[in-house]
């Protein structure tokens, strides 16, 4: 397993495990932010963030591994990270627009929702990207 494929496999497994721990650690940290209003909504948002961390900790290495099996460069790695960030960002935007339309603008509550639902999965993907960036060598520079 000393070859480049072995390093990539170990990098994918390590990225998944470390990103899972980082994401759940952030969820535990954000739980300490006070919740104003209905605590059921706060608990549901925290559960969404925690489940998103679990999903992205598993799905991320699969997507990164598939992408890097096709093109092993850092641009492809960045593209895969952007693709992985689209669903949590879209979910947050949809929920924030719906909340603002029906209940009004509540900055503190919406900021907490951002912290609980988007930050943990985004941190999970970021940790995976940074670990795999160490495994994938930079592109060789072209000299004239």
Predicted regions and their residues:
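Cytoplasmic juxtamembrane interface segments
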Residues: 1-2, 46-72, 130-140
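Alpha-helical transmembrane segments and their helix-start/interface "positive-inside/aromatic belt" motifs
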Residues: 2-14, 71-80
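Alpha-helical membrane-associated segments of multi-pass integral membrane proteins
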Residues: 7-16, 91-96, 101-139
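Hydrophobic transmembrane helix segments
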Residues: 14-59
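C-terminal TM-helix exit segments that contain a strictly Trp-centered aromatic cap at the helix terminus
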Residues: 19-31, 53-54, 86-101, 117
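Membrane-interfacial segments
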Residues: 30-34, 70-75, 97-102, 135-140
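Short, highly charged, low-complexity non-transmembrane loops/tails of multi-pass membrane proteins
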Residues: 40-42, 138-144
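Loop-to-transmembrane helix junctions at the membrane interface
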Residues: 59-94
């Amino acid at each position: 397993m000393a070859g480049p494929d072995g390093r990539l496999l170990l990098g994918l497994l390590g990225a998944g495990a470390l990103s899972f721990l980082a994401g759940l650690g952030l969820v535990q940290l954000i739980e300490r932010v006070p919740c104003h209003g209905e605590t059921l909504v706060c608990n549901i948002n925290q559960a969404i963030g925690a489940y998103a961390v679990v999903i992205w900790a598993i799905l991320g290495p699969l997507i990164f591994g598939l992408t890097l099996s096709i093109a092993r460069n850092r641009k492809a790695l960045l593209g895969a990270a952007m693709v992985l960030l689209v669903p949590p960002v879209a979910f947050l935007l949809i929920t924030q627009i719906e909340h603002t339309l029906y209940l009004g603008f509540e900055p503190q509550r919406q900021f907490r929702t951002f912290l609980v639902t988007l930050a943990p999965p985004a941190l999970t993907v970021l940790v995976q990207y940074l670990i795999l960036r160490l495994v994938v060598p930079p592109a060789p520079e072209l000299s004239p």
